[in-house]
A protein has these predicted regions:
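A generic fold-level signal
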Residues: 4-7, 19, 35, 89-92, ...
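Short loop segments at secondary-structure junctions
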Residues: 16-20, 30, 100-105, 120-123
Length: 146
């Protein structure tokens, strides 16, 4: 019997306001990432040992979008969303965040994504996403203000 590995990750929802309408950034995961290839996700990554989820969130944003800390603002920190994927042998602990993007035109995706799109949050259900992405978004939106 295989053991299930507890795996903390961050998922960051970057937002921008387009003429009064809120949009969130989603990224299509490349074939080069370790799981859920070609699925849509927020900006996400493993929480490294000795690093807080808050710090990891800023690191993932910088690595995956090129945005620096002064180009985003953390708005909310959601409650952890859990998901067990026996096929991967992982029990995910998803730390969701909501960020305001101060420089959306500066975003450049890295190798982890094949494309990125700004969508209305209501459109999320139209995409094949990583597990629990909608729940993570709801948690982030309803999370504590930072």
């Amino acid at each position: 019997m295989s053991s299930i590995q507890k795996t903390p990750v961050v998922t960051c929802f970057l937002t921008r306001n387009d003429s009064g309408e809120l949009h969130i950034l989603i990224a299509r995961r490349s074939e080069r990432v370790g799981s859920y290839n070609a699925r849509w996700a927020g900006v996400s990554g493993f929480v490294e040992a000795g690093v807080s989820p808050d710090e990891q969130a800023f690191t993932e944003i910088r690595e995956e979008t090129g945005l620096q800390r002064d180009q985003v603002r953390m708005l909310r920190r959601g409650a952890v969303v859990e998901y067990e994927d026996a096929s991967l042998g992982r029990h995910w602990f998803i730390h969701p965040y909501l960020f305001e993007t101060l420089a959306p035109d500066a975003i450049q995706h890295d190798w982890e994504a094949t494309e990125m799109r700004w969508i209305a949050p209501a459109e999320l259900s139209n995409f094949e996403t990583v597990p629990k992405l909608a729940e993570a978004y709801e948690s982030a939106v309803n999370g504590e203000k930072t």
